[in-house]
């Protein structure tokens, strides 16, 4: 979490808090943790897809490890809902490494910049009490100005150096 200056946000939301993987570390900030099946008392039983922030928050961070679902359908829905809420300006999610691909990054409109990608170590997850490997990274997307947008740009790899003859 040192990659994000948490003091810059009026509100921090963990939309799929589960057992508090992120929110346990964010408790000293103005934070809301949500889950449809909360595992801790401070986590609000709330469906992320029906949640909206108050308009009196200027800068909102959404952070967490959303469920991925088959072909990342659920993680994309979590992103899409965050993008609909106007005062959310940073989304920091653990996502499968397929989000390194341009086709998956296109979910973010042009005004969103990929600020940072932090590769998670092997066996960062547990399943039934056992370490479990899922190739994932922590992606930080923002509407703020960034030094360099790390979004994959396929145009950078187009060349005019070859002529194709069919």
Stretches with model-predicted labels:
Residues 1-166:
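Class I S-adenosyl-L-methionine-dependent methyltransferase catalytic core
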């Amino acid at each position: 979490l040192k990659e994000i200056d948490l003091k810059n946000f009026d509100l921090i939301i963990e939309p799929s808090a589960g057992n508090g993987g992120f929110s346990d570390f964010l408790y000293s900030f103005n934070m809301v943790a949500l889950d449809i099946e909360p595992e801790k008392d401070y986590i609000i039983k709330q469906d992320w897809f029906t949640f909206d922030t108050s308009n009196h928050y200027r800068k909102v961070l959404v952070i967490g490890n959303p469920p991925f679902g088959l072909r990342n359908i659920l993680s994309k829905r979590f992103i899409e809902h965050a993008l609909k809420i106007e005062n959310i300006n940073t989304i920091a999610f653990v996502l499968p490494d397929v989000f390194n691909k341009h086709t998956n990054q296109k979910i973010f409109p042009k005004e969103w910049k990929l600020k940072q990608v932090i590769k998670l170590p092997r066996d960062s997850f547990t399943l039934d009490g056992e370490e479990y490997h899922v190739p994932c990274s922590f992606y930080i997307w923002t509407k703020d100005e960034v030094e360099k947008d790390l979004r994959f740009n396929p145009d950078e790899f187009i060349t005019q150096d070859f002529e194709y003859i069919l």
